[in-house]
Amino acid sequence: MYRKFETELAGRKLTVETGRVAELANGDAIIHYGDTVVMVNVTASKEPREGIDFFPLSVDYEEKLYAVGKIPGSFQKREGKPADKAILTSRAIDRPIRPLFPKDFRNDVCVVATVLSVEQDNSPEVCAMIGASVALSISDIPFGGPTAAVNVGYVDGQIVINPTVAQREHSRLKLTVAGTMEKVTMIEAGADEIPNDTMLDCIKAGHEEIKKLCKFIEGIKEEVGKPKFEYVSFATDKDVYAEIKENFKERMYQDVQAVDKEVRDANMDKLAEDIQAYFVEKYGEEETEAKSTEIANSIHDLEKECVREMIFKEHKRPDGRRIDEIRPLSCEVGVLPRVHGSAIFTRGQTQVLSVVTLGTKSEEQELDGLDEEESKRYMHQYNFPSYSVGEARPSRGPGRREIGHGALAEKALVPVIPSEDEFPYTIRVVSEVLSSNGSTSQASICGSTLALMDAGAPIKKPVAGISTGLVTSKENPDEYVMLTDIQGIEDFFGDMDFKVGGTKDGITAIQVDIKNDGLTYDIIKEAFERTKVARDYILDEIMKPQIAEPRAELSKYAPRIITTTINVDKIKDVIGPGGKMINKIIDATGVKVDIEEDGRVCIYTDDAENGKKALKMIEDIAKDIEVGKVYDGKVTRIMNFGAFVDIGGGREGLLHISKISNKRVEKVEDVLAVGDEIKVKVYEIDNQDRINLTMKDLEENKENKEEHVEE
């Protein structure tokens, strides 16, 4: 049944349509926000997926270029694999809704958000997040929502909900907040050194709008929502769990405590073997095999209980640290000989190698998406090979997690990257995870900062990253213990991974993942305070002693840049017909040249002399030819009516036979030859921009002319 609902969001009308499309889906919604239109459809499998210990949720955010009137640039002229922005949006849709499904639910659920039309002032990403909540809430799929989301900006000291394009250009903050009526369930932010208190105020302002949207969606659910279907529960078998707990909890409590991840993993593997042997001895192989899934789930749940109990009741962590203690840290710069900049950052058993490459303007990353942005000058890429966690599996390229972590580290450094005018390089940073035991993205932030300073990139301030975790009471969710610098096991069994990157003066990036029903403002405030203390420690005590500021000189292997500005009208002359002139310069000097529409020219070279030569050639072409001025010329062609003379920069003028000498010249060859270097004066530039030259009355040529005429 078709229904239409309307509300207001940030002073603009938001419309939700249901029952109009995809009648075979479990739930559907079309969101209209201005001229932005996003369709979201959700489906669930009728039967659970067997043999898994996780909830199989998939989210796809599909960018259709027809939404902005573009044809894809690929050979096949159709959308290919999702762009990074689409993958990041898929993750942003996923993270706030995933914790709200039943923990024992194993049916496949698929959320597909398709962007149909885009007005740049109205974010399709936010529409997709709202649409996913609407479609799930009104569907028959078990879901504990609704949730909602908004973007928040900070413009001229004012908090702005869902800022327009013009406002985003002047905003110091790009924040996405998602939540329920009661709590915040997701935070994603890039910021220009925003203080903790201001960031919290922005999150609160966003959540107030979210509450209104959740109430609106709840009203839609009451009117058109379907009853939720019954599902097969995959909850842990209580009897199996109780038996394992009674016989093995004390040992597990001890075995899970180890500084070294390998030791802990070995302890748990041996314990699992002994538990299996216990069941075989007591119940026989056949019955034990039949209960294998229940046994494995019970071991997992008991380990989780031990870790959480240890942290919550004893304020003790598996590796023996205090709840606010950071793992041992170290860093090193200049670790690779021929790259432009490099660093290794180590935090406990997490280690990341970051490498910087400086390139030319033409090497910027081209973007073919729904945004107006066409290229990206600074890029960070994150790789997570299997050996970093001691596994043996082939690499198949970056997955969604790698793209998400890379984007977070990139976001953290963007505010301190020098402008193109200050540092006209394209900058690529690659972070290779060498060993992983949690917080690799935060190690990538620290490693990127160190590598950029090692490369001599004049970043405005160093940036560090740290993550906090959370363990809440089962009986009272308002009681909790917060952990600074979480390792893998604490992330895995905890309720939160609150990542914050920033300088000593403020926050530059946030990414928050949760596994419970959301965060209160008090938790968010404490997380900001904890990460600020830890960040300052890392910056002052670990990174600063290694390299306090960017190197004064670039690596000798990095390209050098010479910049100049030419008249916009001269760009066509420098390039030449079909690129003739610019290619001539490149071939003659071996440099790379980028010319901007505003006349800015960048020359990239490994050889200073060649760079100067190219600069002179460009300036010669770009300089204005002045009537009445004398130029050094070189004869390039002899014709029966005169000679063509190059007067610099590939500009040729005609020296008519009548203008060669005050005396009569019968043949041009009697006076001039190809290759002769002569002085000429520009006496005219005609209406077709043709240059006419003369040698008459020039003393510098007098002797040369007379010799030729006498001969």
Segments from the language model and where they lie:
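Extended amphipathic alpha-helical scaffolds
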Residues: 1-45, 232-372, 559-573, 581, ...
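Long, basic N-terminal domains or extensions that often function
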Residues: 1-232
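Conserved phosphate/anionic-ligand binding catalytic regions in large, soluble enzymes, centered on
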Residues: 27-29, 122-140, 333-356, 437-457, ...
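Mobile "lid/hinge" segments at catalytic clefts and subdomain interfaces of large enzymes
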Residues: 140-259, 452-552
